[in-house]
Amino acid sequence: MNRYILFFIFLTGSVGGITAQQAKIDSSYANWYYQQRMAYFEKLPTIQRAVIFLGNSITERAEWQELLADYRYPVLNRGIGGDNSFGILARIDDVVRNKPRAVFLMDGINDQFRKLPHEVSIQNYRRIVRKIKMKSPRTKIYIQSALPINEMITTEDYTRGRNELVPELNKKLSQLAKEEDVVFIDLCPLFQDDEGRLSKEYTVDGVHLIPTAYIKWVKLLKDKKYL
């Protein structure tokens, strides 16, 4: 699906008044890969009270079931490579249909690659969180920070100038978590270097994590008693 929709984003000024900004937003998400993953999810067995990792390719590439093979509850991977906040919002009803025990949500970087205004991403996050609360009120919700990227390694033009957008997005995600009374997990200290970039130790392409990085990720979740 390739479609563009027009948003009127209202931003409250720090001094007074409300200013309206008009932005053309790329809200597309349902490409062939998204559709194939959704078809795959639909054919999987129904599992109640699972722990779900939800997000884009950074989530999808993790072997969560193996990383948490000794965990006492089922663990499901609901990552879709290339997904963004619009795509996750569109499929959240399916994600929580079977009343998961917990949802670990991570998104954001693909929104940044499109240069979506943070207000749009946060609005989508808020709607995702509220849909989970409405459809599955006993589900524990964890918002995980967007990870930095390393523009010294990335090769695609759409990654240029994007890493500087990540800290502000994460500040707004942290504030959203407080407002919605859910848990915010800051993963950035695990994987960033002194310059705030995704450390070369943990990436090959400047965007995605190497497999062993996920061991560190899961250790943090266990240490914090989120798992």
What does each model-identified segment do?
Residues M1-A23:
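Bacterial Sec-dependent N-terminal signal peptides
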Residues A20-A102:
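Serine-esterase "nucleophile elbow" of acetyl-processing enzymes
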Residues Q22, P148-L227:
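Catalytic His-Asp segment of secreted/periplasmic serine-dependent ester chemistry enzymes
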Residues N77-I80, I109-S121, E156-R162:
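Surface-exposed cleft-lining segments at the edges of enzyme active sites
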Residues K99-G108, P137:
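Proline-aspartate-enriched helix->loop->beta-strand connector
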Residues H118-I128, V166-L169:
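Charged helix-capping and loop-helix junction motifs
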